[in-house]
């Protein structure tokens, strides 16, 4: 950067390709100085020796741990030290056609019961309208992320506090059964992924969608590459934004409201240019921070919430940022302060599998091998019952666990 005098080469990598690339680079001794990555991989990489924990922890100390989201630091902690530096995050959302829900007298879809009731009531495949659209692609992390929110909502956990895999628990079987029934009965046919689910909702062909908040600027007609195409959108491009409700957290019959959260961090590769990496990250999270959040405020909530002098400075600045690509607007002016406040409050209560039980390395493994999306697809294809899929998911997770522990 100009400010630090450090020359930076930016290499863009797809999220699904990260695990393999880090392994290849580790083998060839070419780990990146700084790797921007989702928390799914942080603890696993640290325990594999791919991240310089001491270097990252020093950055957090230099910037003051109290200025970061405590939850984000907890997710990235290994043996009492922060393994990578939290940058930003987002919480997954269930969006729904509030106009159609209101007209049908349906409750907001914040529980399994309300979600299924609405999907059944509004599903009309003969007119190309579906109760819900959500990911079912066996090869996509997006399916893991989507299902995990439903699992967490029903208190279906990856492991118990003792580290025993619990994917075959009654709660997990129930979550698998609910999710697959929802998609089998009330969703479009075929493989659904991050692109097709958005396209279906934007075409006005679905009552509900599960997606990240990156959809918010697109739904507000701010990005030409992903424009709403519903019939009403021709005359009113912001029709969907005006008529969609937003649910951050959902609850199943055996759980309490939960929201899947994704935190992005900056890790420092082992045996790399550590001092330059530390200087770059400290600049990124101070003088360069708001410029970074401006890239996509709808999906980049600040995990460094402020400074020692003003603990909420970055949150306050974030609320004023304009989102969009081809057009720009402040999200609060489109969706209202209540929605924005919900996004802010949710950022401190994100839920995830495994991390609080010290299973970050196992999380990294299953996000790489994807036994859960594969199991979901097996049920949808008729190749397994929810009970069989849960047992297979658990068995594959246990195999990963045994490999990691040398058992």
For each predicted feature, which ranges?
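A ligand-binding cleft/hinge motif common to bilobed small-molecule-binding domains
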Residues: 42-46, 213-238
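Short glycine- and hydrophobic/aromatic-rich loop-to-beta-strand nucleating segment
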Residues: 92-96, 151, 266-268
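Hinge/lid segment of periplasmic solute-binding proteins
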Residues: 39-91, 143-146, 233-250
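C-terminal lobe and pocket-closing loops
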Residues: 219-220, 236-238, 253-370
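Short amphipathic alpha-helical coupling segments at ligand-binding clamshell hinges
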Residues: 6, 174-178, 272-284, 389
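Glycine-centered hinge/linker elements that transmit conformational signals in sensory
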Residues: 119-121, 162-191, 235-249
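Extracytoplasmic "Venus flytrap"/periplasmic binding protein-like
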Residues: 3-68, 99-110, 200, 207-208, ...
